[in-house]
């Protein structure tokens, strides 16, 4: 049987999901190389800092929306049948203020906070809240059953599933994407390289995509558990500040955030933002603390900053050739990488298969 050597560059949720789907074909021999691996916490490595949840942001009819629709069944299946993955079902209430519609956070969440969103027909238990249940200042709100992902469990779980299928993991730092072709664990040149380097695609040689930019998100993890997820379209603290609360599965703590700061590279938590995040979280869901308590009732595990790997024209999922190396790109997913992970990986795998088929056909001539 013919075998095909594939190198996936990047071990965030996009790279790991792509490697997992590739490794399900026995003929594919997959090596994952990355500067950062699950267990690392670094400003260059976005995936561990994610909330993470399923909250569709894509505009109706867009590729983004279709990717979110197509990924939901996989996340739902994991929550139902493989709780060891760190994914569990959780209700979420989403609040919308019309005055946020022209802010960075309001535009980011416009589809999510719509009173009639495209995803209402397939998420679980969707309902619009009656007006008499809306908090002061809220113009509309919805509730449905989503999933929350404990990234500290899920990313290592993806690694374990890849390894079960024969994937080999190696740490490496590349200056140029073409170098990846020489890093396959077989010692042979890779048939295809899959670029899942996220924000690093801005500076990686052979890619150098100037459409890639960071969107800074500051969060904190607390031990307090309000019992369900909550978010809101914006805040009065600034157009790039927002509030969300995500209790993670299996003792992962509750993520509270946050910020949506485009082109901000600051890796350090800002104490002023942190204070505002706490104040907003308590206003959004007072169940976080005991009655009568303020922010002093929040039991903080740690503060964090992540840089969402956004791209001006949206994710890049396409074939390329760089210095004679066949490359498939899969990067630029911004703050929605988890909720499009399976569908974008499936598209990338399809492109890899096209390249391999072409190579196979040429070899027979």
Describe the residue ranges of each PLM region:
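Eukaryotic N-terminal targeting leaders
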Residues: 1-5, 23-28, 37, 355-365
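Conserved N-terminal glycine-rich FAD pyrophosphate-binding loop of Rossmann-like flavoproteins
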Residues: 2-4, 36-66
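Active-site substrate-recognition segment that forms the wall
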Residues: 7, 14-25, 32, 48, ...
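Short beta-strand to alpha-helix junction loop
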Residues: 60-74, 141-157, 268-273, 340-341
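Flavin (FAD/FMN) cofactor-binding and adjacent substrate-gating region
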Residues: 73-166
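C-terminal catalytic lobe of FAD-dependent flavoproteins
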Residues: 130-132, 157, 291-365
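Helical element adjacent to the flavin cofactor pocket in flavoenzyme catalytic cores
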Residues: 138-192, 196, 201-203, 351
């Amino acid at each position: 049987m013919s075998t095909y050597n594939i190198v996936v560059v990047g071990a965030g949720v996009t790279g790991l999901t792509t490697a997992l789907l590739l490794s399900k074909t026995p003929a594919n021999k997959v090596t994952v190389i990355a500067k950062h691996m699950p267990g690392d916490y670094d400003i260059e490595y976005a995936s561990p800092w994610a909330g993470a949840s399923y909250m569709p942001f894509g505009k109706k009819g867009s590729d983004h929306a279709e990717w979110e629709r197509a990924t939901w069944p996989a996340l739902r299946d994991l929550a139902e049948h493989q709780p060891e993955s760190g994914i569990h079902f959780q209700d979420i209430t989403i609040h919308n203020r019309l005055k946020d519609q022209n802010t960075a956070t309001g535009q980011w969440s416009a589809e999510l906070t719509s009173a009639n969103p495209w995803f209402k027909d397939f998420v679980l238990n969707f309902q619009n809240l009656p007006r008499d249940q809306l908090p002061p200042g809220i113009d509309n709100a919805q509730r449905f059953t989503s999933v929350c992902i404990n990234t500290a469990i899920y990313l290592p779980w993806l690694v374990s599933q890849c390894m079960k299928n024969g994937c080999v993991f190696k740490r490496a730092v590349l200056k140029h994407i073409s170098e990846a072709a020489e890093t396959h664990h077989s010692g042979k040149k890779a048939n295809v390289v899959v670029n899942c380097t996220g924000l690093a695609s801005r500076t990686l040689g052979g890619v150098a995509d100037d459409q890639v930019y960071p969107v800074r998100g500051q969060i904190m993890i607390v031990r307090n558990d309000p019992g369900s997820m909550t978010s809101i379209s914006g805040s009065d603290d600034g157009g790039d500040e927002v509030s969300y609360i995500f209790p993670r599965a299996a003792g992962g703590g509750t993520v509270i955030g946050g910020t949506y700061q485009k082109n901000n590279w600051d890796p350090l938590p800002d104490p002023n933002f942190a204070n505002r995040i706490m104040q907003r979280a308590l206003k959004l869901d007072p169940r976080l603390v005991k009655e009568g308590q303020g922010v002093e009732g929040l039991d903080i595990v740690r503060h964090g900053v992540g840089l969402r790997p956004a791209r001006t024209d949206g994710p890049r999922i396409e074939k390329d050739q760089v210095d004679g190396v066949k490359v498939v790109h899969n990067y630029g997913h911004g703050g929605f990488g988890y909720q499009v992970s399976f569908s974008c990986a499936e598209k990338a795998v399809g492109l890899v298969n096209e390249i391999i088929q072409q190579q196979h056909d040429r070899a027979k001539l």
